[in-house]
Amino acid sequence: MASRFIKCVTVGDGAVGKTCMLISYTSNTFPTDYVPTVFDNFSANVVVDGNTVNLGLWDTAGQEDYNRLRPLSYRGADVFILAFSLISKASYENIAKKWIPELRHYAPGVPIILVGTKLDLRDDKQFFIDHPGAVPITTNQGEELKKLIGSAVYIECSSKTQQNVKAVFDAAIKVVLQPPKQKKKKKNKNRCAFL
């Protein structure tokens, strides 16, 4: 039996770690230099909960220069991984201000996995000494944002340590294979019509 193809597209501000997350997941390595979106589309068979799927990963550039091109990669997406950096308040705020309106416009109804990246830096005291303007985003703030945008799942990860990186992509696959049940509207059985 052929495995199901799932198109997974990563979206979010530039420099939040989307490409690093993809490289960490697919090659178990962490690029030490900032490389703006050089991840080629990637496809591999992945087994999650006994189901084999062909996972297609698409990277996008978050920079404004790509605002007109980026939506072309949304076509046919089964799930979005919407990323912000846990050490960048601006990237967190842009989830609701920029990315959700864009995704809802170009790909309404496609499930979203909300991901907080750079988890290793959130508790790194030296990072905040070196970057006094940086404001960490808490897990509670991430959970609140998940509810606000209607995301299926919220996960925090570190591509550098690989903490929860596999969990991000497993969640993306699961939300496609087992979509959350929609709340059914109660039907009024005691209806009558006057003619």
UniProtKB/Swiss-Prot annotation:
Transmembrane segments: none annotated. This is Rac-like GTP-binding protein ARAC4. A motif (Effector region) lies at residues 34-42. NCBIfam families: small_GTP. It comes from Arabidopsis thaliana (Mouse-ear cress). One of its GO terms (cellular component) is nucleolus. GO terms for biological process: anisotropic cell growth; cell morphogenesis; cortical microtubule organization; microtubule cytoskeleton organization; petal morphogenesis; pollen tube growth; regulation of stomatal movement; response to light stimulus. Keywords: Cell membrane, Cytoplasm, GTP-binding, Lipoprotein, Membrane, Methylation, Nucleotide-binding, Prenylation. The modification Cysteine methyl ester is found at residue 192. The lineage of its organism: Eukaryota, Viridiplantae, Streptophyta, Embryophyta, Tracheophyta. One of its GO terms (molecular function) is GTPase activity. Belongs to the small GTPase superfamily. Rho family. GTP binds at residues 12-19, 30-37, 59-63, 117-120. InterPro entries: P-loop_NTPase, Small_GTP-bd, Small_GTPase, Small_GTPase_Rho. The gene is ARAC4. A lipid is attached at residue 192 (S-geranylgeranyl cysteine). Inactive GDP-bound Rho GTPases reside in the cytosol, are found in a complex with Rho GDP-dissociation inhibitors (Rho GDIs), and are released from the GDI protein in order to translocate to membranes upon activation. Involved in cell polarity control during the actin-dependent tip growth of root hairs, thus regulating root hair length and root hair initiation. Contributes, in a SPK1-dependent manner, to the prevention of cortical microtubules organization into parallel arrays oriented perpendicular to the axis of cell elongation to limit anisotropic cell growth during petal development. It is a peripheral membrane protein. It is found in: Cytoplasm; Cell membrane. Ubiquitous. Interacts with SPK1, ICR1, ICR5 and PIR. Residues 193-195 form a propeptide. Disruption phenotype: Fewer and shorter root hairs. Plants lacking both ARAC4/ROP2 and ARAC3/ROP6 exhibit long and narrow petals, as well as increased anisotropic cell expansion of petal epidermis during flower development, as a result of increased microtubule ordering in petal abaxial epidermal cells.
